[in-house]
């Protein structure tokens, strides 16, 4: 399968092309010098041709299968965004609201960060993490195309460890279910007992003789 077309002019580097694909707005530009540093590639499996394509300054995406290039760039991206320079780049995107806001009403449009549910490629797509309610949500469809491993499971927490001044306060308000203004009892919100669940069998202490008596021989 050939690479999807960019929303921008196709002439340019592979990274320009990748970042220009609609739905890739969460991703960050990894500098060429970071990719060229072999230390940053330690432990990643790839061939030299894949790396050359990622670093190609004049990439032509016609009839080109980009699966391996996307994976390599994605795994490098996950490492870069937890580096000091990468965190600063992501901070700018966070403060601009590039990642969207929490869908929870009482978080009052708190800005969110991208997060992965796995650190392994091709397990799940990217999700969004709200630092206010400390929950994870599915992003809008056009923002959920990237692999979650591009961000990893640790990124939001590393981000706020480095930038503690950006940690928001937890939400004060909480939704309270009501009917005609009256608050519901907790039991009213619990699911009914399953009809299929077997009844609890209670053995009568009267119907059975104690074990010591049953073992007495008859005379």
UniProtKB/Swiss-Prot annotation:
Domain of life: Eukaryota
Coiled-coil spans in chain: none
InterPro entries the UniProt entry points to: Casein_kin_II_reg-sub_N, Casein_kinase_II_beta-like, Casein_kinase_II_reg-sub
Cellular component, GO, one term: cytoplasm
Region of interest (Disordered), ranges: 194-219
SMART domains the record matches: CK_II_beta
Polar residues composition-biased segments: 204-219
Gene Ontology MF: a single term: protein kinase regulator activity
Family note: Belongs to the casein kinase 2 subunit beta family.
Identification of the protein by name: Suppressor-of-stellate-like protein
């Amino acid at each position: 399968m050939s690479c999807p077309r960019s929303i921008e002019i196709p002439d340019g580097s592979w990274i320009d092309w990748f970042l220009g694909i609609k739905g890739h707005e969460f991703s960050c530009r990894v500098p060429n010098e970071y990719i060229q540093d072999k230390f940053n590639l330690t432990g990643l499996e790839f061939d030299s041709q894949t790396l050359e394509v990622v670093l190609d300054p004049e990439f032509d995406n016609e009839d080109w299968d980009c699966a391996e290039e996307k994976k390599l760039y994605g795994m490098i991206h996950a490492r870069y965004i937890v580096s000091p320079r990468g965190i600063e780049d992501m901070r700018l995107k966070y403060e601009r609201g590039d990642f969207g806001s929490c869908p929870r009403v009482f978080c009052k449009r708190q800005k969110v960060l991208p997060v992965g549910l796995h650190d392994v490629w091709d397990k799940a797509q990217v999700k969004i993490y709200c630092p206010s309610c400390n929950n994870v949500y599915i992003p809008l469809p056009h923002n959920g195309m990237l692999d979650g491993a591009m961000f990893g499971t640790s990124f939001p927490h590393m981000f706020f460890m480095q930038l503690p001044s950006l940690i928001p306060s937890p939400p004060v308000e909480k939704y309270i279910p009501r009917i005609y203004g009256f608050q519901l009892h907790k039991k009213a919100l619990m699911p009914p007992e399953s009809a299929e669940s077997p009844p609890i069998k209670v053995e009568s202490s009267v119907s059975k003789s104690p074990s010591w008596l049953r073992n007495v021989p008859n005379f």
